A protein has these predicted regions:
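Core nucleic-acid recognition elements
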Residues: 1-505
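Conserved small/polar residues in nucleotide/adenosyl-binding loops
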Residues: 511-513
């Protein structure tokens, strides 16, 4: 196995332009009044494979570049080419993903690579990076400031060449992000016979987002004599949960999964009349109960509140399902990745409804701080205009690459969304009322002894603690691991495969986990 570097950059000439570079140039001008004469871009591919550099070079234009509008180069960088880059830039910045973080462009390139080289090692892998060359910077901004607007340090790494380094031909060279070897560790047993301060410490250090009352409820559960006896009978440590058990409880009780605020008792006082009342769960009182009451009167509410999405009968042949959810905290840390994960996640909720529905349309509502905000921004959080662009792009790309159009939406601006945006992602799905074998498509039929498969894209190091993180306030120490990056292209393949399996009668039950 060896690393081969392939780069592609737009050609210059009449009618040709560097779109990526122009987008960055206009963004810096709009957000920071930085007037640049030009920004040029290079897309890089780092190929870890047993295929030789010579073989790759011969096919570079078939996969990594469009020879009509782009140049390609193997095991060199275009910045060293005086023919292509005939002027010395004022700054150069290269951006790539950190080791283990999901790299969707790399995955797509790898699919094509394996098509062209079917005998390549199964261990072959491709990572990507983008290099930007800036002209006309002068004293308007430092390279470090420009870089801070190009990459997200939670999931990406950047290398910078200053004007002096550029004059000396010292160019940034992003290297292949080798993943550290994975080591299996036995689950740790957690002693809960501790004081309240230590219970809170376990919750905080483990990003469990559980308050003292919840931690004490868990402590009480593992003190229960029946629980201890049952655990002892099956060979489990009777009085100490594993860290995995605590993670499962914390995820189940998270705001993302449990919606504790909507489920709690709300003490309400009417400011005009002074009348006081208690609402026992906004969700159960004002959403579930009216829906169940309606279900008694109509025959078209087929499935509500117990599956991945609700199902209604559209006509005698088709059912429609719809689901919407928020993805606020991840979108604050990484607007593009957080929003993309939100939309492809709710796509999977539709797919996981009943025996499988096809997602056919997306919708969204975004709430951000004012895009022209001139005040302070908390450290490690982004300006509202950057959040707006990233979220919009993430939802757009997530839908388009899955083959699901976004048909409508709304955007609201308010100062109260400076600290955390509100990102609603919704999907509409379609399913036949009955499958070819006569089963009703909205009814799952699992039985004991069924074979269970888990399908999807490869899991990266991103997205850990994403559910529990939804219950925490955003701070300067918010964890990078909580940001997950979706993979819409792989998901599109999965959707088509599962719906084909559904129609063949192979699926008894499925769920989005």
């Amino acid at each position: 196995m060896q690393i081969t570097r392939v780069e592609a950059t737009p050609r210059s000439g009449e009618g040709l332009r560097d779109v990526r570079g122009d987008v960055v140039r206009r963004r810096l001008q709009a957000d920071h009044s930085i007037q640049l004469t030009e920004v040029r871009s290079i897309v890089g591919f780092l190929i870890n494979s047993d295929i030789t550099a010579e073989q790759i070079s011969q096919r570079a234009d078939d996969l990594f570049a469009d020879p009509i509008i782009e140049h390609s180069l193997t095991n060199q960088t275009f910045l060293q080419s005086k023919e292509i880059f005939d002027q010395v830039p004022d700054a150069v910045i290269s951006v790539g993903f950190k080791p283990g973080v999901t790299d969707n462009p790399g995955k797509a390139a790898l699919d094509g690579f394996r098509t062209i080289f079917p005998n390549a090692s199964i261990e072959s892998d491709i990572s990507t990076y983008i290099t930007y060359a800036f002209y006309g910077v002068k004293d308007q901004a430092t390279p470090e400031f420009i870089a801070s607007n190009l990459y997200n340090g939670l999931i990406e790494r950047a290398q910078i060449s200053t004007a002096e380094m550029c004059e000396n031909n010292e160019w940034p060279m992003i290297e292949y992000p080798a993943r550290p070897p994975q080591e299996f560790k036995q689950p740790a047993h957690i002693d809960l016979e501790i004081n309240d301060d230590k219970l809170i410490e376990i919750s905080e250090t483990g990003l469990l987002a559980l308050n003292l009352e919840e931690m004490k409820a868990i402590q009480s559960h593992y003190r229960d004599a029946v629980v201890r006896r049952t655990r002892q009978e099956v060979g489990i440590v009777e009085n100490q949960p594993t860290d995995v058990e605590l993670e499962c409880l914390a995820q189940t009780w998270s705001e993302h999964c449990k919606h504790k605020i909507f489920a709690s008792k709300i003490h309400h006082r009417d400011l005009e009349t002074g009348e006081e009342s208690v609402v026992d769960s906004i969700f159960k009182t004002h959403i579930m109960k009216p829906t169940h009451d309606m279900q008694q009167e109509v025959d078209w509410l087929l499935s509500v509140f117990h599956d991945n999405s609700g199902v209604i009968a559209w006509d005698d042949e088709w059912s429609v399902c719809m689901k919407a959810e928020t993805h606020n905290s991840p979108s604050a840390l990484d607007p593009y990745g957080g929003a993309m994960t939100g939309i492809v996640g709710v796509n999977r909720d539709i797919l996981g409804t009943g025996l499988g529905a096809r997602p056919i349309a997306n919708t969204d509502v975004f709430c951000f701080g004012p895009p022209d905000w001139q005040g302070d921004i908390p450290e490690n959080l982004f300006h509202p205009s950057r959040v707006l662009r990233g979220v919009h792009s993430g939802v757009r790309v997530g839908g388009n690459e899955s083959g699901i159009p976004t048909i409508n939406g709304a955007i609201i601006f308010d100062e109260r969304y400076l600290g955390k945006p509100l990102v609603y992602c919704g999907t509409v799905g379609l399913m036949p009322r009955k499958l070819p074998d006569g089963r009703e498509s909205h009814i799952k039929t699992p039985t004991a002894g069924d074979i269970v498969y888990m399908v999807g894209g490869r899991v990266g190091y991103d997205g850990i603690h994403g559910a529990t993180f939804s219950s925490l306030e955003l701070t300067e120490e918010s964890p990078s691991s909580a940001v997950q990056i979706g993979d819409p292209i792989t998901q599109k393949k999965m959707i088509d495969m599962l719906l084909e399996a559904r129609d063949a009668g192979l699926i008894l039950s499925l769920i989005h986990i």
